[in-house]
Curated annotation (Swiss-Prot):
It comes from Allochromatium vinosum (strain ATCC 17899 / DSM 180 / NBRC 103801 / NCIMB 10441 / D). This is Ubiquinol-cytochrome c reductase iron-sulfur subunit. The gene is petA. [2Fe-2S] cluster binds at residues 134, 136, 162, 165. The main subunits of complex b-c1 are: cytochrome b, cytochrome c1 and the Rieske protein. GO terms for molecular function: 2 iron, 2 sulfur cluster binding; metal ion binding; ubiquinol-cytochrome-c reductase activity.
Amino acid sequence: MLASAGGYWPMSAQGVNKMRRRVLVAATSVVGAVGAGYALVPFVASMNPSARARAAGAPVEADISKLEPGALLRVKWRGKPVWVVHRSPEMLAALSSNDPKLVDPTSEVPQQPDYCKNPTRSIKPEYLVAIGICTHLGCSPTYRPEFGPDDLGSDWKGGFHCPCHGSRFDLAARVFKNVPAPTNLVIPKHVYLNDTTILIGEDRGSA
């Protein structure tokens, strides 16, 4: 029934249905708006990096106090293996003999910070810091520090060999010619906090 000037008159079934429909639409719109507001909160929160994600990308420290000449230390940074190699005097002396056999002996391709664009690709000549991922298809090469092994040839002066497809890198992480890998291994940003601690993933410019 609806009020009129003369009292009340009956509402048709069609009118009742239309009114119900309007009420339902309005109620649904209100609930939908409120629900969207609540749904937005976890979505926005999910776009913020979690503590674990931030930690995964954070710099890591490498303690080299017990790293003997010729030895390699593996550190995990951003989910990637990072190598720290303590090169012996013999290893350093052999580096220049590799130059004619390398794709990029002077590190012209920017695979390293500017402060590592030198013959040893390092801050301190005796310590190499490199990401242990082959630049071909992302395998992790094997550390082969020995000189002249049977499987790598008499002219091998130590380095890294990728068993997946045969790429080779010397002890400055520089790629040899005629192998699948196109570029030298990546040298990450790093800085020496003291004589025995390297901070990997950060340097003086970003500290």
